[in-house]
């Protein structure tokens, strides 16, 4: 079997070196005498470094050992620069301490963001790193400020200007091997830390009253509860990391050779070893529960209530206004659908629900929320005239039996539709001749007359009072065109009218339209009359017929004269308008 060329070359080199080894080997030199200098011997080394060096030398082949001895000459007792650089220059305690500090994230340069520093304000920690339009790395606050205002965020708007210098000094103190004390709390300038109170977790009452402990329905989305949990958790993690770093530095510093034991802060280690939960507290009122942490003008951490009070009034909120429980408003959400102002139970056809109390604006509900109020529609439709007044007018209307008989007899031939709304009692009109004729003109019923009864009465109402004894006679007189257009003077109305004249005037005073509907001498009208219903009234009827003819002629003459006067007035008005048109001219 033939060997490869590389293997044969290696074997030849080994044989040559084995034959020439005795000729090359130099005698070992004697160690130099100890000197009075304070420097340690060159070949002396302590700790695991010498052990590692010896292991590496023992692992070398004999040929490499011989080559190493040959490199040393009796006269030159100094090591080569290569070996001098390989020798460690610091103690093992320092080496391990630096690694632990960098691993635990206590140095800002390696704090979870690969040494990122905001190019604008210089901060090293932010929830989100952004980039400026020029490509520089900026923090979340500077990025949002630049996006909103299109200007660089001032460096001292949130933190004092000496923050960067203090961070550098703290980093140098952490790297120094002389001090093994870890920070008790993370460096957050302007923040106040207090021990969390011993309120049992999960004791939040809910219903808009939050104490930050959770446990109630809806606490998963409560900002006050989430804020408290996240802040306390992050502070506890950083505190435990600081305590672990300090405990790891202590035994390693004691193992160092030739070094004095470092000073330890026992109080800080004792406090850090305790399992105490710390939370951020408001600088103004000291509360630890808030849905949003804010900062004042000096950079101090304050709660949401104090921040809003300071922003509104310009002064810090008094401590007496602090409340142990955060009270949230509960807005009344209108019902989904077309009309949110009226509920299904409040339909106009359904009776009003009297058991449900009215929801007025400003009232407090059972769960402690403030009711903003809902405008409810009235169940009954609004009317201009109250129902009781209309009922009183219907009861007090003086309608005679003859008028009612004529009214019912005129509607006997019409078909009856009971379900139709136009035939209801409220929508039907009384006969014209049954209505009472006022002195001048009857005043219409207005809502103002019912709302303010103490107002001054009108002249027509005053004039109606002395003629109350003539109501029975006046309501029988029909409303003719003459009475509407030319009201009679009060002297003629108040004069004495005999019963015979009343009987003569009743059929004659009807208008032609009314006479066509109800004839003057129809059997129904005479049968319904209470005056001429007996056989002994025949002579009176004959005399009344003659008087009626004379009165009708007289009334026709009066009517003719009134129409002539109206025509003359219309002519004058027409002439005045024609003159005005003539003055304006034609186009």
Curated annotation (Swiss-Prot):
Biased composition (Polar residues): 9-18, 55-64, 82-93, 508-537
Keywords of this entry: Coiled coil, Metal-binding, Nucleus, Repeat, Transcription, Transcription regulation, Zinc, Zinc-finger
Key word Zinc-finger present: yes
Major location category of this protein: nucleus
Sequence segments annotated as region (Cystein-rich region (CRR)): 204-222
Amino acid composition bias (Basic and acidic residues), ranges on this chain: 466-476, 544-561
UniProt region (Disordered), positions on chain: 1-94, 335-375, 448-561
Domain comment quoted from the record: The conserved cystein-rich region (CRR) localized between the zinc fingers is also involved in DNA-binding and transcription repressor activity. Both the N-terminal and C-terminal zinc fingers are involved in DNA-binding, although the C-terminal finger plays a more important role in the binding.
Protein name, UniProt field: GATA-type transcription factor sre
Annotated source species: Neurospora crassa (strain ATCC 24698 / 74-OR23-1A / CBS 708.71 / DSM 1257 / FGSC 987)
């Amino acid at each position: 079997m033939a060997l490869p060329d590389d293997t044969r070359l290696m074997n030849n080199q080994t044989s040559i070196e084995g034959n020439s080894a005795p000729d090359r080997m130099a005698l070992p030199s004697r160690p130099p005498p100890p000197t009075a200098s304070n420097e340690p011997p060159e070949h002396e080394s302590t700790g695991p470094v010498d052990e590692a060096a010896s292991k590496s030398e023992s692992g070398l082949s004999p040929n490499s050992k011989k080559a190493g001895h040959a490199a040393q000459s009796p006269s030159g007792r100094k090591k080569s620069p290569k070996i001098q650089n390989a020798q460690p220059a610091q103690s093992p305690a320092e080496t391990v301490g630096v690694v632990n500090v960098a691993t635990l994230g206590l140095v800002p340069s390696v704090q979870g963001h690969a040494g990122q520093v905001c190019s604008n304000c210089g901060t090293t920690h932010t929830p989100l790193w952004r980039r400026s339009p020029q490509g520089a790395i900026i923090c979340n606050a500077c990025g949002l400020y630049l996006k909103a205002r299109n200007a660089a965020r001032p460096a001292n708007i949130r933190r004092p200007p000496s923050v960067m210098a203090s961070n550098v000094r703290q980093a140098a103190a952490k790297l120094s091997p002389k001090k093994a004390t870890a920070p008790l709390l993370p460096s957050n300038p302007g923040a106040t830390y207090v021990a969390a109170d011993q309120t049992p977790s999960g004791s939040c009452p809910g219903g808009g009253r939050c104490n930050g402990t959770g446990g109630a329905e809806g606490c998963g989305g409560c900002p006050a509860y989430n804020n408290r949990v996240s802040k306390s958790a992050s502070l506890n993690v950083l505190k435990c990391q600081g305590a672990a770093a300090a405990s790891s530095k202590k035994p390693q510093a004691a193992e160092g050779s030739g070094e004095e034991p470092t000073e330890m802060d026992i109080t800080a280690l004792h406090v850090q070893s305790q399992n105490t939960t710390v939370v951020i507290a408001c600088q103004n009122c000291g509360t630890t529960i808030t849905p949003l942490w804010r900062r004042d003008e000096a950079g101090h951490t304050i709660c949401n209530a104090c921040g809003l009070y300071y922003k509104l009034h310009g002064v810090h909120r008094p401590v007496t206004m602090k409340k142990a429980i955060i009270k949230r408003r509960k807005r009344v959400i209108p019902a989904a659908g077309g009309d949110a102002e009226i509920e299904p139970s409040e339909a106009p056809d359904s009776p009003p629900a009297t058991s449900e109390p009215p929801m007025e604006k400003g009232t407090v509900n059972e769960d402690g929320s403030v009711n903003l109020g809902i405008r409810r529609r009235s169940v009954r439709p609004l009317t201009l005239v109250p129902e009781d007044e209309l009922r009183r007018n219907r009861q007090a209307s003086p309608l005679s039996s003859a008028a009612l008989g004529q009214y019912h007899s005129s509607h006997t031939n019409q078909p009856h539709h009971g379900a139709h709304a136009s035939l209801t009692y409220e929508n039907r009109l009384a006969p014209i001749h049954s209505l009472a004729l006022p002195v001048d003109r009857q005043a219409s019923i207005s809502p103002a007359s019912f709302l303010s009864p103490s107002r001054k009465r009108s002249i027509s109402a005053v004039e109606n009072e002395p003629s109350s004894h003539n109501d029975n006679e006046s309501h029988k007189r029909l409303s003719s065109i003459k009475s509407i257009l030319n009201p009679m003077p009060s002297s003629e109305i108040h004069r004495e009218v005999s019963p015979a004249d009343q009987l003569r005037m009743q059929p004659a005073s009807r208008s032609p339209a009314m006479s066509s509907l109800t004839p003057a001498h129809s059997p129904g009208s005479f049968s319904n009359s209470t005056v001429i219903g007996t056989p002994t009234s025949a002579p009176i009827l004959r005399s009344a017929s003659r008087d009626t003819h004379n009165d009708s002629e007289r009334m026709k003459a009066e009517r003719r004269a009134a129409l002539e006067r109206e025509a003359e007035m219309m002519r004058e008005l027409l002439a005045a308008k024609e003159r005005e048109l003539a003055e304006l001219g034609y186009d």
